[in-house]
UniProtKB/Swiss-Prot annotation:
GO MF, one example: alanine racemase activity
Active-site residues from the entry: 375 (proton acceptor), 601 (proton acceptor)
Residue numbers of N6-(pyridoxal phosphate)lysine PTMs: 375
Recorded family membership: In the N-terminal section; belongs to the acyltransferase 3 family. In the C-terminal section; belongs to the alanine racemase family.
Taxonomic lineage from the root: Bacteria, Bacillati, Bacillota, Bacilli, Lactobacillales
Stretches assigned to the Cytoplasmic side: 1-12, 61-77, 142, 213-218, 270-276, 329-702
Extracellular topological segments: 34-39, 99-120, 164-191, 240-248, 298-307
Source organism (scientific name): Enterococcus faecalis (Streptococcus faecalis)
Membrane topology field: Multi-pass membrane protein
UniProt name for this protein: Amino-acid racemase
EC number, as in UniProt: 5.1.1.-
Spans traversing the lipid bilayer: 13-33, 40-60, 78-98, 121-141, 143-163, 192-212, 219-239, 249-269, 277-297, 308-328
Amino acid sequence: MKHRANGIDLFRIFAATMVVAIHTFPFQSIAPFLDEVITLTVFRVAVPFFFMITGYFLLGRLSLNFSYNNNQRVKKYLYKIGMIYLYSILLYFPLSLLNGTISLKMNILLLLKVFIFDGTFYHLWYFPASIIGTILVTLLLRSIGFKLTVAFSTCLYLVGLGGDSWYGITNQVPLLNKLYTFIFSWSDYTRSGVFFTPVFLCLGIFAYRVSKKLTASKILNLLFYVFIIGMTFESIFLHRFTNVKHDSMYLLLPSCALILFLMLLNWQPKLKVKESADLTLLVYILHPLVIVIVHSISKYIPILKNSLLNFLLVVVCSFILAQLLLNLKRKLRVSKQKIPFERASKEISASAIHHNINEIRKIIPKNTNIMGVVKANAYGCGMVEVAYELEKIGISFFCVATIEEAIALRKSGNQGDILILGYTHPNRINDIKKYNLIQSIVSEEHGKVLNLKKIPIRCHLQVDTGMHRLGVTPNVTIIQQMYLFSNLKIEGIYSHLGSSDSLEQESIARTNTQIFLFNNILSDLEQMGISYGYTHIQSSYGILNYPELSFDFVRIGILCYGFLSDYNSPTKIPIDLQPIVKVKASLITERIVEAGEYVGYGLGAKVEKRTRIGVVSIGYADGIPRALSNAKLTLEFKGQSIKQIGNICMDMMLVDLSEVEDISLNDELIVLPNISKIADEEQTITNELLSRLGSRLGTELN
């Protein structure tokens, strides 16, 4: 929704100014009636606007999907607002004591009333109201759904309305009088998180739900004018003919706030205000302090007692003070740029990831989507960073091997579907549910035990078509039974090809048998009337050697990272790949070793002449194979080749710097300049070499 935020962000400034006006009465010295009509009526849209922002950006997604990440966002918001409220209480504590809002002589119940509902200073009610309202709406959404939540919140607002601007009327009804007497024993006003906040949070949620369909409309403008004029007449009537207890709530205020918010979503001003949310939050918190200061100064400068001038001065000073604090925050904040890893790191190329995915998309059918296989820490490249980049280019389905990997990916903020390819013990079923993961059913027994747990979970059914590793027996009767289990929501079915990386005749025959068996199972299930969900059987080599296949997904692993597993095995379809990872380490010290001396562990490396030796801060614990010791590994620095000498140690390695120019301590060297060549020389595959890269290596995404 970032493309719709410009109008909202700019209006935050106007709304914050309106709040200042409500607390300063700018027209008091000129025409008090204008304060009644404008300040205490029209400007009342300001606070609902801020609550609607919370509903739109925080609870909108939650109302559609109670995922782990959406729930975490709510928890973080509540914690943040709670801390802001605490700091604000401390800031205004002396003034709260002076004006009697709180007193050390108050009993516990009265203090709770002040802290939970009223706020310890007149503007601080907003923060507990936001917390209570958010908790209430979240619980209602979870238990009764959005429509009933709106209805319930509307009823709460109407109750609150009767204790606010309409109190002069409702107070005449004995039963209602008793109700409001009880309510006011707990809160000075009905403008609170119980009666006021929920309806505006719901309106923000509604705006989120309709925002994609929203278009600019003159009808919205007309409706806004109708409702704002109607609310003005409502206010005039209530102020003139009734005893208004407060004027925060009007019958037409929700309608005005909703139409205004929808108009702002369509408004795309060129002017953009940086950090408008933080700026206006600080203005809201600080402006009463500025009011006190300006009021004190006005005793010595009488002209400042002019209400309009007083208001303008408070607004200007509040924004200046808020901006100064933001500037200070930037200076104190740790630089957003990652601190360079002084020891060793992996540099991940975002552009290479994009390139590789684009090349893959050229090969697969247009209707086939990509699953990003990010197991084993994205083949050693950095699971969180790679998945983040894949999400940016439209990949929203990810595969991992274990539930621990899946949870780590979800906790990183990943919003996509996450399929666990491997076995997960049924005792972890609560975690599968909690983190909204998709579990592979890897055997008949696995499926039966998971179903007996009586906790509904999302699943994909893995079928053993000939790999003979994981998967249920390719018997359609058994598979049908899995689909009938009430607690297994099977959303897809898949298999794995055991020999798709080879074009030898025996490998082709095995692969074709697997594909034939898989297709037959799908056909039989279809004839049985079973909706089997998504289908996928190809991994990286499956798309290169069997591009004619057309299933819902392909599982892309090694190709995403810019490598083939084995460059000696030809593929039917060529592909232009760019390696996404560079392994770098720092030169941490150097020294001269005289001829005839041994270096490193053992006696395998003896220098024949006076040699300049350097120490590079990476070793076999970081994934560099120890078998590459003694000149089998070549590093690079600014295009120069540097030979590794001696045995590679756990945490470092030695290099010969005798022929290297312009290298200094702390310079970074490329440690594995040609991963595919090294894998070939070590008679392994690039998958293994990459997956060895250790967790001590930092990850830099560029």
